[in-house]
Each structure stands twice: as C-alpha cells, then as structure tokens.
C-alpha cells in the first residue's frame, strides 16, 4: 500500500523536475490560497474541533491564517531552485535540488494548520509529500490535503505531489518512514523517536514546556495580557504555550491581579484535587497527563475536577512548588493551566527557569518580559533552549510572527538538548539538497605567524615567567640548605 503512494509521489515529482523558480512559487501560492481563504479555513477549523474535541473554532481560524500567510511571506522571493547563492571571492556556487519524497507525520492537536504549512514548505523545494495523520484527526487532515490538491489542479501541477494516508495506523506510518527520502515528525515523543529509529533521515521536534520570567521592570499590563492570550489561545493546543511564569515579588500582586481580571481563576485549596484529575495512572502504573484535559477549556477542566468556576474563566492558575522536579505542575500541561512562581533577585528567578526547563522541555523555548538588556543577555547566553522570546506571547512568537523575525513554521527543532538533529525552526531550507560547485583560484595559504603567532608568543612569555619564578624559589631556599 505504501509503495503505491511512493510510486505516485515519485512520478509527480519527476513531472515537475523542469519547473523553474517562478513556476514552483506559483504552485506554492495556489496551494496556499486553498488553505488560507476564509471559506475553506472555517471548514477546516470546524472539522478539527468536531473530530478531535480539542481547541475552539475562532482561534483555529486565526492560527491557520497566521501560519499559512507567515510561511508564504517567508517563501516569497526565497531561492529554492537552481543557483541559490554565489560567493565570488571564494568562487563557490550553490545549487538547490529536491530531497525527494517527504513523509510528514501530523499531530492530533493541530491537524489542519500543520499539514497546510508544512505542505507549502516542502513543495517549495520541488518535493512531494505524503502525510500520515493522527488516527483521531484523519478526516480533518484529509480535508486540508484535498484543498491543497485542488490548488495543484488549478495550476496544472500533478495532484500526487501531495497525498495523505486515508486510514492511518502505526504499521502504515512505520512503513512510510522507511520508504520515503526524508521524515518530518511533528508530534509527541514516541512519534519522534520512531522517526529517528526508522533508518531514514528525519527532522523531529521536542516536547514543549515554555517558561517566562516576568521581571520587575516590565510593562505589567502588557506582559499579563500577552501571557493570558497565549495561554488561553485555542485552549493551549500549541506546544509553545506558556506552562509557567516566574514573577518578581515587587509586581507579583499586580501581575496576578491582572491575570484574574482578564479571566483567570487561582486554584488554591483545590490544587491537589486538580492535580489528581490532570495526572492519572496509566497502563504501565505511572502517572501521566489525562488525555481528557488536553486542549480543553478551563471551565471544562475545572468542572470535571469538581472545582466551581464561572463561565468567563479562560485560564486556571496554580502556585508553583519548591520541589520542582517532583511537582507535576512544573511540566508541560497541554491545557490552559498556568503555574506561577515568585522570586526576589534575578539569579533566583533564573535558577527556577533553569530547573523547570531542565526537568521537562529542555531545548524548546523560554522567554522574559523585561527591558533590561543584561537580563536578556544572561538568558540568551546561558539557557539550554533554542528560542528566547522577549516581551512576546510565547505561543505566537516561537514559530514566527508578523511582530518578530523568527522563521515561520509549525515544526520547532530543539537541538541535541531535546533529542533533535536541529535547533532551528524547520523551513524550506531543510528540504533541499545543496550542491557546492567550487572553482580553482590562486592558493591563499596563511603563514604560520598568522595562525600561531599570538599563541606562541603567549607560550614564550609564560615560559619565561615560569623560569624566573622557579629561580626565585631556588634563591629563597638556598641559604637554608646544608653544606656537606
């Protein structure tokens, strides 16, 4: 069965082998429009919510439009066919070529925006793609693929450049990963591990657990609004949604008060009750996230846990615990539940940030609301995360937004920290092979002095100092030596 998909994908790709940059760009725009226009996006968002029971329709519409338009913005005028770069000084020319057939695995939490964005991204390099949807979101993902194929049809491109496994299973997905040229795994840890174990070159993503420091000098109202919006958006389906905030004690009351005013409820006496509902014992005897809470509304989660909140509540707040490594609320929660810590000095806040991220979600992302460049520098130079957002909503900013310079994507590499091959936002550049053409030029060999000169002079100076110090010690000791 998978072999048939592969054959059709290769035939389609071969049929566009002659396409110029302008022609493939036209294809990307046509495909993009079909998963961007208001009529189709509403259908996709509605299908995703109805099929998966996750998120909400208005936010999915907004997410879809932002992601697709953001990707197309980045692709506009970008070179992905033929000569893409030339260095006249080094006499180097770089030529882009397709990687081939890509097997793209998609998550249940984002079953339409992910294939839409990744489909366009993969097409940019004249590749073909076969999507393996999550079984619980197969109809929504197929709808997105059908819309994209309609875009291909309208510009006369082969429809089988984009395909989907209509009845997905672990076995079929495993076979797909073995037969394609490259795998893109956007989803949970087991999926990513399977991709890396397939024997096929693969790009994977790491688990999220985004944490923000709310510094004493920040714009409190702005920071609170951005955190609240990010955490409540689409019921926190995004892996970039803030899971914890670390608030300076001097602004703690104002910040939390603003979160409550915006529509948050601080769970205090019921904290243990909420924890026991959110993390249940699995088949292996370990406590893990309750699937019933993933991307559900704060009201639904609270009601199910037996906690009374009003209809207006969009985010549940819990106080952070000192035993971070043992506390479940320190982890990724995949729900509109936010853990709140407090700190006095920056180093204390930084250590909490580090512990939270090292405990879960290493390599993914963190952020800070501040205007203090020293704070920003410390986090940027020291944290083991691939992204640091400054004065931004994490869910919107990590994957690229119109208010920052991050590359637009729905797939976030987390580097070796997160068990991934790249720490970059995954874009079209990851789906082209590049041939380097090198021409001969007159040799420019550096002298030994240029490379080693400073070092050898330092060694010589150090040696001279060491000899003088040793001689001084000998002179000091000599009066006390016995004469035989």
UniProtKB/Swiss-Prot annotation:
Q: Which UniProt keywords apply?
A: Carbohydrate metabolism, NAD, Oxidoreductase
Q: How does activity depend on pH?
A: Optimum pH is 9.0.
Which sites are catalytic?
239 (nucleophile)
Which reaction equations make up its catalytic activity?
Answer: sulfoacetaldehyde + NAD(+) + CoA = sulfoacetyl-CoA + NADH + H(+)
InterPro entries the record matches: Ald_DH/histidinol_DH (IPR016161), Ald_DH_C (IPR016163), Ald_DH_N (IPR016162), Aldehyde_DH_dom (IPR015590)
Class in the EC hierarchy, top level: oxidoreductase
Residues annotated as binding NAD(+) are 105-110, 188, 206, 332, 412
EC number of the protein: 1.2.1.-
Signal found in the keyword field: no
Origin superkingdom: Bacteria
Q: Which GO terms describe its molecular function?
A: oxidoreductase activity, acting on the aldehyde or oxo group of donors, NAD or NADP as acceptor
What function does this protein fulfil?
A: Part of a variant of the sulfo-TK pathway, a D-sulfoquinovose degradation pathway that produces sulfoacetate. Catalyzes the oxidation of sulfoacetaldehyde (SA) to sulfoacetyl-coenzyme A (sulfoacetyl-CoA). Is highly specific for NAD(+), with only residual (1%) activity with NADP(+). Cannot use acetaldehyde.
Family per UniProt?
Answer: Belongs to the aldehyde dehydrogenase family.
Q: What is this protein called?
A: Sulfoacetaldehyde dehydrogenase
């Amino acid at each position: 069965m998978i072999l048939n998909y592969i054959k059709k994908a290769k035939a389609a790709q071969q049929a566009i082998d002659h396409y110029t940059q302008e022609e493939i760009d036209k294809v990307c725009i046509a495909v993009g429009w079909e998963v961007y226009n208001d009529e189709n996006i509403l259908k996709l968002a509605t299908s995703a919510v109805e099929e998966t029971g996750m998120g909400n329709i208005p936010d999915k519409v907004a997410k879809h439009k932002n992601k697709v338009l953001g990707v197309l913005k980045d692709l506009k005028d970008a070179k992905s066919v033929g000569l893409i770069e030339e260095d006249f000084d080094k006499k180097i020319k770089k030529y882009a070529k397709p990687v081939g057939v890509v097997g793209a695995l998609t998550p249940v939490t984002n079953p339409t925006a992910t294939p839409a964005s990744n489909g366009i991204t993969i097409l940019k390099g004249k590749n073909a793609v076969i999507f393996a949807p999550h079984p619980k979101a197969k109809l929504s993902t197929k709808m997105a693929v059908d819309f994209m194929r309609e875009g291909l049809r309208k510009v006369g491109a082969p429809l089988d450049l984009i395909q989907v496994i209509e009845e997905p299973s672990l076995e079929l997905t495993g076979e797909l990963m073995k037969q394609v040229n490259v795998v893109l795994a956007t989803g949970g840890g087991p999926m990513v591990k399977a991709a890396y174990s397939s024997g096929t070159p693969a790009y994977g993503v790491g688990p999220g657990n985004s944490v923000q420091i709310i510094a004493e000098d920040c714009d409190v109202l702005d920071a609170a609004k951005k955190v609240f919006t990010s955490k409540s958006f689409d019921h926190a389906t995004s892996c970039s949604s803030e899971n914890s905030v670390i608030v300076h004690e001097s602004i703690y009351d104002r910040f939390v008060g603003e979160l409550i005013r915006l529509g948050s409820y601080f769970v205090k006496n019921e904290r243990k009750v909420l924890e026991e509902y959110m993390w249940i014992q699995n088949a292996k005897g370990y406590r893990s996230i309750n699937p019933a809470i993933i991307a559900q509304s704060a009201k639904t989660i609270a009601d199910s846990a037996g906690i009374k909140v009003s209809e207006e509540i969009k985010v549940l707040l819990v106080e952070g615990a000192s035993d971070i490594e043992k506390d479940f609320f320190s982890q990724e929660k995949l729900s509109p539940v936010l853990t709140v810590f407090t700190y006095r000095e920056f180093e204390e806040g930084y250590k909490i940030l580090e512990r939270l991220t090292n405990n879960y979600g290493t390599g993914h992302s963190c952020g800070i609301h501040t205007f203090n460049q020293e704070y920003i520098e410390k986090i940027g130079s020291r944290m083991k995360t691939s992204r640091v957002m400054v004065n931004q909503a994490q869910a919107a900013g990590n994957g690229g937004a119109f208010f920052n310079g991050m590359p637009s994507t729905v797939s976030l590499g987390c580097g070796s920290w997160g068990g991934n091959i790249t720490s970059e936002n995954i874009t079209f550049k990851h789906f082209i092979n590049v041939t380097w053409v090198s021409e001969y030029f007159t040799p420019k060999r550096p002298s030994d002095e240029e490379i080693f000169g400073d070092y050898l002079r330092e060694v010589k100076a150090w040696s001279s100092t060491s000899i003088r110090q040793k001689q001084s010690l000998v002179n000091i000791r000599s009066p006390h030596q016995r004469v035989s």
